[in-house]
């Protein structure tokens, strides 16, 4: 604990908490101040001036990062017949129907992404209380309820991330790993920022992005100037 506190203090000393850094500076500083002993995840966090209670100000979706995520996702697909075979051929880790529902109801959760064909959603609905709180419930807005299961599996395996604004207007997303080149992290950050900017509700008032930061697993938050993106 003492060593962790020492590392944290050392990291904080390198950061000017009153400054909003450019995206390039922030990425470099996030890597420099990372003290995790493993290949830490790099994440960005937005606070948006939106009211998610209003239907037209809810922000949710998915995208494929240009440089990938550095993470291998375990993909589960609910499908039958030809669509099940397509999912398997595309590289899905788990494919099934009632058997998977029973397994999940029994406490099994060794997967990161859940995809389903539309005709399977009545079955998947039984898992709402398990998958919903973990943001694993398939949804058309994130491309995880689809007949094109092969594409969905390939995207999930190839750098797809999902995002959603919480009740306070916060949106968080991973943009890669500390081991990534700075340029790849910057590219991913800019690509995600473009999606967030384009998602601005027409009815949103005032400054849209009120706070933006980048951090690593166990790292400290570094303010980013939205105008640098």
From Swiss-Prot:
Keywords: Repressor, Ribonucleoprotein, Ribosomal protein, RNA-binding, rRNA-binding, Translation regulation, tRNA-binding. Disulfide bonds: none annotated. Belongs to the universal ribosomal protein uL1 family. Binds directly to 23S rRNA. The L1 stalk is quite mobile in the ribosome, and is involved in E site tRNA release. It comes from the Bacteria. The keyword Repressor applies. It holds the Pfam family Ribosomal_L1. GO terms for biological process: regulation of translation; translation. One of its GO terms (cellular component) is large ribosomal subunit. This is Large ribosomal subunit protein uL1. Part of the 50S ribosomal subunit. One of its GO terms (molecular function) is tRNA binding.
């Amino acid at each position: 604990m003492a060593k962790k506190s020492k590392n944290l203090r050392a990291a904080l000393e390198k950061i000017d908490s009153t400054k909003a850094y450019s995206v390039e500076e922030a990425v470099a500083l996030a890597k420099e101040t990372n003290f995790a002993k493993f290949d830490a995840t790099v994440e960005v966090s937005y606070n948006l001036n939106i009211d998610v209670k209003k239907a037209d100000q809810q922000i949710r979706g998915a995208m494929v990062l240009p440089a990938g995520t550095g993470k291998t996702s375990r993909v589960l697909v609910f499908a039958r017949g030809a669509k099940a075979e397509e999912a398997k051929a595309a590289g899905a880790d788990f494919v099934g129907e009632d058997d998977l529902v029973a397994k999940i109801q029994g406490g099994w959760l060794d997967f990161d992404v859940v995809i389903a064909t539309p005709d399977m959603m009545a079955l998947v609905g039984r898992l709402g209380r398990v998958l919903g709180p973990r943001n694993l419930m398939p949804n058309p807005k994130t491309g995880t309820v689809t007949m094109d299961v092969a594409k969905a599996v390939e995207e999930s395996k190839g750098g797809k991330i999902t995002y959603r604004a919480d009740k306070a207007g916060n949106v968080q997303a991973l943009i890669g790993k500390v081991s990534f080149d700075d340029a790849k992290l910057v590219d991913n950050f800019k690509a995600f920022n473009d999606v967030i900017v384009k998602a601005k509700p027409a009815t949103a008032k005032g400054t849209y992005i009120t706070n933006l930061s980048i951090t690593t697993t166990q790292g400290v938050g570094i303010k980013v100037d939205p105008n640098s993106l």
